[in-house]
Amino acid sequence: MATVAPPADQATDLLQKLSLDSPAKASEIPEPNKKTAVYQYGGVDVHGQVPSYDRSLTPMLPSDAADPSVCYVPNPYNPYQYYNVYGSGQEWTDYPAYTNPEGVDMNSGIYGENGTVVYPQGYGYAAYPYSPATSPAPQLGGEGQLYGAQQYQYPNYFPNSGPYASSVATPTQPDLSANKPAGVKTLPADSNNVASAAGITKGSNGSAPVKPTNQATLNTSSNLYGMGAPGGGLAAGYQDPRYAYEGYYAPVPWHDGSKYSDVQRPVSGSGVASSYSKSSTVPSSRNQNYRSNSHYTSVHQPSSVTGYGTAQGYYNRMYQNKLYGQYGSTGRSALGYGSSGYDSRTNGRGWAATDNKYRSWGRGNSYYYGNENNVDGLNELNRGPRAKGTKNQKGNLDDSLEVKEQTGESNVTEVGEADNTCVVPDREQYNKEDFPVDYANAMFFIIKSYSEDDVHKSIKYNVWASTPNGNKKLAAAYQEAQQKAGGCPIFLFFSVNASGQFVGLAEMTGPVDFNTNVEYWQQDKWTGSFPLKWHIVKDVPNSLLKHITLENNENKPVTNSRDTQEVKLEQGLKIVKIFKEHSSKTCILDDFSFYEVRQKTILEKKAKQTQKQVSEEKVTDEKKESATAESASKESPAAVQTSSDVKVAENGSVAKPVTGDVVANGC
């Protein structure tokens, strides 16, 4: 049996082995720096010991890991979003909400096929492998292929190796002249002519309301959002400029560039606030150029480090989108940047739809232009200028004249001349107080028009033409109404497609003439016509009629009807009563002069198109005649007499006629 040492001896032995003195260090280098980093995370050493870590070390900055003399090639694949904490793009409609506080130039491009979200590198400035002069912790090289707003892709850019030269003078960005099409008027870049926040003057009187910008005055310090020093707060009444009016994040405060119309936005060195307009003004005018886009694909364009350069527009009211321009509206391609993200040109057209009220729903997104195959050259408007909230006739004529300028037409009709020549119907003959609303027998139909241009012609000439099936349906209804004793009027409720309203009520006063075509309509596809008389001309919103359902149309609201949809007597009388009692402040008569100018433009274009077709047909006929004569001259000189049984050969001998099985040898 082993002898056990007494407890006193054990304690003495332990005290001899223990030592409270710290071992001498070989050098002043901290212990963590001596350790190998191969198995630093999750690994163990050969003895099975878990390595210890010193959490008091200073974290390594990107500038410590990046050698300024080495070229860092950008990664062609976009990594996962890791700026989510700071409000970077997490949705299709998001942009990073923060910008580099030193005011480094922003990018103005989109990422290519590999990108799944909008991913500008850093906090709002372009991908750049070198450190700006004022950045204490610069970002590393760009990690995604950045493409510009063109229809082609730029190749990768490989910058020259070498440190960033802060002593290089920043060139002053010159003013660029706008590429203005011929005949297009441009608002002068004069601050005195900028409209106030209450409205913009239009014509001689009246004002069109605009959306206020609520842009507060920014702090003049070099930091962002007015917080130059730690603890700095925002001014009273300040609205976060990172959010645009459409709910999208903006990489820089939303600003107004109307004072710099059609020129490049200047960049000054007085601070961030000097790059933005401090007044509440209307959005920028058309055809505004910002700067050359030569810095795509990780190329940083030199600019002032104390002020922001401007970026090309993406979303409406975020950067001042151009109504039309060289590169179209790039960022509007379904809010995704895949194969459809490069120069979408607004579904193949160079005009962007900035006002949904003037969009031709289902017929293109342009403001004045629609289908290029349309002979008229003007798209179909579902609502006229009165939708802007002004009833100034002279202002409407200005809009009409602008249409002709945009389409390349000569400005022949002046405002004064149009006032004298335009014949607006007398308003007293419509919306009469004694118009009856109760009928024992009556028939009602819904009429859907493609545009208000055709409704204008109908009121002007008291005529209408429907589709072939619609004309047959109305013709049968008119014959049936004529056979009823005591009379049976046929009322037509007119509505324009996608307008959200009805424009009036008319009565059919004659049969359909299938053999008479009128040349009034915007398109030449309508055949036949019938006379009518307008009783009520006013704008009646659909919201007043949605409660009326039609049993003969699957109990759908009357506002969801097709052309020549019949309405029963009970529902029809309710609609007539609503039409009469509704007090409307606008009607199509307010835009009558506007549509008069459009009608003249359409007729001129039709005449030119017809003349062009006639000249082309004439040239084609002349070419055919010359080709026939040339082919006849190339034929053999032998003359063949077909009206006789005697054939004259080239040598003058006579060939006897062939009879039966006898062969004529011509001897």
Swiss-Prot record:
Changing residue 526 to A: Abolishes binding to N6-methyladenosine (m6A)-containing RNAs. The keyword NADP does not apply. Its main location: cytoplasm. Transmembrane segments: none annotated. RNA binds at residues 448-450, 454, 464-465, 497, 521, 526, 534. It is found in: Cytoplasm; Nucleus. The keyword Cytoplasm applies. Residues 267-285, 628-639 have a biased composition (Low complexity). InterPro entries: YTH_domain, YTH_prot. Residues 264-305, 379-398, 606-667 are annotated as: Disordered. Residues 614-627 have a biased composition (Basic and acidic residues). Disruption phenotype: Aberrant trichome branching with an increase in number of spikes. The double mutant plants ect2 and ect3 exhibit delayed timing of leaf formation and altered leaf morphology. Interacts (via C-terminus) with CIPK1. This is YTH domain-containing protein ECT2. It comes from Arabidopsis thaliana.
